[in-house]
C-alpha cells in the first residue's frame, strides 16, 4: 500500500496484566527493538503497527533506553565478567546454550548471546579482555554462519529491576 514506508511492529505483551506469567523474552526484545528504532533518524516515513493494549503499556523512557544501549565490535576492550554483569543488568538470562532472544551463555573465551533487535544470535570471541571477533550463529545447531563488524546491544527487557524502573512501573 505504501512501499516507500518502513513498517515497524510494536507488539503487546503476550500475557495478561498482573498475571503470574511474564511476557516472553522474544516479545520484550521486539518491543525494545522497536522503541530503539523509533529513536533513530531515518529518511523514510515510518508506520507503526500496534494495538491499543501495546500502546498503553508502561515501558522504558527514551532517555533510559539510550542510557542502556552499548555498541560492541572487534577491538573493543570489555572483560567477559564485565559483559556478563552488563547483560544481567539489562535483563538477559544466563543459560547453558543460547536458543532465543534475551539469552546469553559464557563458555571459556566465548560469549554467545541473542541480542534484542537482532535477527541472529551472536558469538563473541575474546582474547583476554578484548573482543577478537563477532560472528553470527544458528541457535538450532550452534554452528557459526558468518562474521559481522559489530552490533548494538539493547536491553532484553522493559522490566529492569533497578530503582528508576521500579518507580516508573508503579
Each PLM stretch: what is its role?
Residues 1-170:
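ASCE RecA-like P-loop NTPase motor cores
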Amino acid at each position: 500500500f505504501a512501499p516507500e514506508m518502513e513498517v515497524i511492529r510494536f507488539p503487546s505483551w503476550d500475557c495478561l496484566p498482573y498475571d503470574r506469567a511474564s511476557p516472553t523474552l522474544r516479545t520484550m526484545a521486539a518491543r525494545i527493538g522497536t522503541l530503539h528504532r523509533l529513536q533513530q533518524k531515518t529518511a523514510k516515513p515510518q508506520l507503526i503497527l500496534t494495538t491499543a493494549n501495546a500502546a498503553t503499556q508502561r515501558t522504558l523512557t527514551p532517555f533510559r533506553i539510550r542510557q542502556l544501549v552499548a555498541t560492541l565490535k572487534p577491538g573493543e576492550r570489555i572483560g567477559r565478567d564485565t559483559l556478563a554483569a552488563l547483560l544481567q543488568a539489562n535483563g538477559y538470562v544466563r543459560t547453558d546454550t543460547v536458543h532465543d532472544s534475551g539469552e546469553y551463555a559464557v563458555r571459556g573465551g566465548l560469549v554467545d548471546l541473542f541480542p534484542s533487535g537482532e535477527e541472529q544470535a551472536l558469538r563473541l570471541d575474546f582474547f583476554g579482555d578484548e573482543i577478537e571477533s563477532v560472528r553470527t550463529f544458528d541457535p538450532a545447531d550452534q554452528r557459526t554462519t558468518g562474521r559481522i563488524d559489530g552490533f548494538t546491544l539493547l536491553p532484553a527487557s522493559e522490566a529492569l529491576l533497578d530503582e528508576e524502573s521500579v518507580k516508573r512501573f508503579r
